[in-house]
Amino acid sequence: AIELNQIWDFPIKEFHPFPRALMGVGAHDIIGVEAKNLGFKRTLLMTTGLRGSGIIEELVGKIEYQGVEVVLYDKVESNPKDYNVMEAAALYQKEKCDSIISIGGGSSHDAAKGARVVIAHDGRNINEFEGFAKSTNKENPPHIAVSTTAGTGSETSWAYVITDTSDMNNPHKWVGFDEATIVTLAIDDPLLYYTCPQHFTAYCGFDVLAHGSEPFVSRLDFAPSLGNAIYSVELVAKNLREAVFEPRNLKAREGMMNAQYIAGQAFNSGGLGIVHSISHAVSAFFDSHHGLNNAIALPRVWEYNLPSRYERYAQLAGALGVDTRNLTTVQAADAAVEAAIRLAKDVGIPDNFGQVRTDSYAKNQMNTKKYEGRGDVIKGDEKTVRAISEHIQDDWCTPGNPREVTVESMIPVVDHAINKSYF
């Protein structure tokens, strides 16, 4: 298990760089020019199930118009798997590509980051690169990341997340932190978010909320991250409902775009916590959507963490729109939890994991066999609750959590997230 005190043992914190980014309405129009200017000749385009939305076809046209050849890998799955990464890296080598473009959300971007690492290390298995700065060869292929969701912020961070499926009796979703995977160019255009379905907009929005709130209360307490962190929470509170229910509301979509990006910058150096640890564990076992997992875990984790960070959660309440002027610090912190629950209810988040059907996710669309035996619902039996709690203990996000975490302390939190209700 990761020692929770290791952060205290290393009080010198590290500020990680951000990539160059093009942000705003119409930014996607110049992807071809940017690819050409970066020297792309034959690029591997990695994406999920976006074919047919019109986005891939439009962007491929803009890229090819500038004389850049495109090789398509469109088999990236939600919660990208180790075999997605290895297949893409092999295709890159077979087709003699010189660059990568990822289009989509965090799954596309993270799979592309993983493929870059594998390519730079002569085809070594991606699962060898879990943890901090495992790359020995930093000369990765150049990478343009184009976002079509406001969620992960992967296009601005040094982190990537991969699911190790080598032992399906003990599936493992791991995090890699490596500056070698920072993208060459990020493109965020709110026009590309218009086709994101309502429920995915909500799920991804809660991913942003987790990315903003966790570094704000993190044990690292990294000052350069705090401003971006809390402002991203404010942007989510102001824009997520409108983005969900008015998908072509440009102001709301742009607000969520900005929230995603600065939340990504916040956790890039400020760290995360057990909202993400729970999410990774549930995804590993059931392949459920990462943002949805965060949404269900978030209020439970906030309640668990409150005693260690009352003042910070009180500030989050203000960012979420709560009038805290006549509240004590503890009352305001409690109100933050209530505001998060209300936001989840408003945008259609299921009340617990037991209400989640996993048969609507990419694993079924891609005909993946790995998760067939898992069923279509998340079951909260004692064995599963303990297995998830043990996975949390070993997650790379857990050391940043403000309150100490043990397997036993997580069991009631996980049990509540699967079997109990807020609404």
Swiss-Prot record:
GO terms for molecular function: alcohol dehydrogenase (NAD+) activity; magnesium ion binding; NADPH binding; oxidoreductase activity; zinc ion binding. Induction: Expressed during degradation of thiocarbamates and atrazine. Its EC number is 1.1.99.37. Keywords: Magnesium, Methanol utilization, NADP, Oxidoreductase, Zinc. Its cofactor is Mg(2+); Zn(2+); NADPH. One of its GO terms (biological process) is methanol oxidation. InterPro entries: ADH_Fe/GldA, ADH_Fe_C, Alcohol_dehydrogenase_Fe, NDMA_methanol_DH. It is an enzyme of class 1 (oxidoreductase). SUPFAM superfamilies: Dehydroquinate synthase-like (SSF56796). It catalyses: methanol + A = formaldehyde + AH2. Homodecamer. Catalyzes the oxidation of methanol to yield formaldehyde. While the in vivo electron acceptor is not known, N,N-dimethyl-4-nitrosoaniline (NDMA) can serve this function in vitro and is reduced to 4-(hydroxylamino)-N,N-dimethylaniline. Belongs to the iron-containing alcohol dehydrogenase family. NCBIfam families: NDMA_methanol (TIGR04266). This is Methanol:N,N-dimethyl-4-nitrosoaniline oxidoreductase. The lineage of its organism: Bacteria, Bacillati, Actinomycetota, Actinomycetes, Mycobacteriales.
